[in-house]
């Protein structure tokens, strides 16, 4: 499997009263931003079309490991992400249950929005809404959740990227 060179870039973000930092991982498939604060990683951002600013400092070790894991995942490797570095403080209780269900979907498998909703105790529409606000795409693999008719459904990185990720994991969509 070919490995790509990745560059880490620090971006400072002012969010309300909280100062956060973001490192970006540049990858041929998509650029990723990992945002963290005092309590851990607060968001993973798919950076398609986002203007980037550079600062050549090195990320903390936990962030570097997460970025390396994301790079390996995008290179097609099977990765067991360390979820302990993620800060779920911005998630509702229901969204956290949905994300817990989705984090257990193995590579090469999918669940429907209805199946996720049943396991999380909600409706398919509320599960889809919770996933549309997934703060940790790729690490919490919401791309593995599809519609009941076998179509991809939506994805914050775009349906084209969702299909590429699923194909990379060996999933072919029936409704396509």
UniProtKB/Swiss-Prot annotation:
Pfam families: DNA_binding_1
InterPro entries: MethylDNA_cys_MeTrfase_AS (IPR001497), MethylDNA_cys_MeTrfase_DNA-bd (IPR014048), MethylDNA_cys_MeTrfase_DNAb (IPR036217), MGMT (IPR023546), WH-like_DNA-bd_sf (IPR036388)
Compartments where located: Cytoplasm
Domain of life of the organism encoding this protein: Archaea
Class of this enzyme: transferase
Span of the signal peptide: none
Keyword vocabulary terms for this entry: Cytoplasm, DNA damage, DNA repair, Methyltransferase, Transferase
EC number, UniProt record: 2.1.1.63
Annotated GO CC locations: cytoplasm
Record GO terms (molecular function): methylated-DNA-[protein]-cysteine S-methyltransferase activity
Keyword Hydrolase tagged: no
Active site: 142
Catalyzed reactions per annotation: a 6-O-methyl-2'-deoxyguanosine in DNA + L-cysteinyl-[protein] = S-methyl-L-cysteinyl-[protein] + a 2'-deoxyguanosine in DNA; a 4-O-methyl-thymidine in DNA + L-cysteinyl-[protein] = a thymidine in DNA + S-methyl-L-cysteinyl-[protein]
Coiled-coil annotated spans: none
Biological processes, Gene Ontology terms: DNA alkylation repair; methylation
Miscellaneous notes: This enzyme catalyzes only one turnover and therefore is not strictly catalytic. According to one definition, an enzyme is a biocatalyst that acts repeatedly and over many reaction cycles.
Xref: PANTHER family: METHYLATED-DNA--PROTEIN-CYSTEINE METHYLTRANSFERASE
Family the entry assigns: Belongs to the MGMT family.
Functional description taken from the UniProt entry: Involved in the cellular defense against the biological effects of O6-methylguanine (O6-MeG) and O4-methylthymine (O4-MeT) in DNA. Repairs the methylated nucleobase in DNA by stoichiometrically transferring the methyl group to a cysteine residue in the enzyme. This is a suicide reaction: the enzyme is irreversibly inactivated.
Protein's recorded name: Methylated-DNA--protein-cysteine methyltransferase
Organism: Methanothermobacter thermautotrophicus (strain ATCC 29096 / DSM 1053 / JCM 10044 / NBRC 100330 / Delta H)
């Amino acid at each position: 499997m070919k490995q790509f060179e990745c560059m880490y870039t620090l971006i400072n973000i002012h969010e309300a009263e909280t100062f956060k930092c973001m490192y970006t991982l540049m990858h041929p498939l998509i650029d990723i931003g990992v945002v963290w604060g005092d309590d851990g990683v607060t968001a993973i951002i798919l950076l398609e079309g986002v203007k980037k600013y550079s600062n050549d400092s090195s990320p903390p070790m936990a962030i570097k490991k997460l970025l390396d894991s994301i790079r390996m995942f995008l290179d097609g490797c099977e990765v067991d992400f360390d979820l302990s570095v993620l800060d779920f403080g911005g998630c509702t209780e229901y969204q956290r249950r949905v994300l817990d269900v989705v984090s257990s979907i193995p590579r090469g498998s999918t669940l429907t929005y209805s199946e996720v909703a049943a396991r999380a105790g909600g409706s398919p529409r509320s599960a889809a809404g919770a996933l549309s606000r997934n703060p940790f795409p790729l690490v919490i693999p919401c791309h593995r959740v599809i519609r009941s008719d076998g179509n991809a459904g939506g994805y914050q990185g775009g349906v084209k990227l969702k299909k590429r990720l699923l194909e990379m994991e060996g999933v072919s969509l029936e409704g396509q």
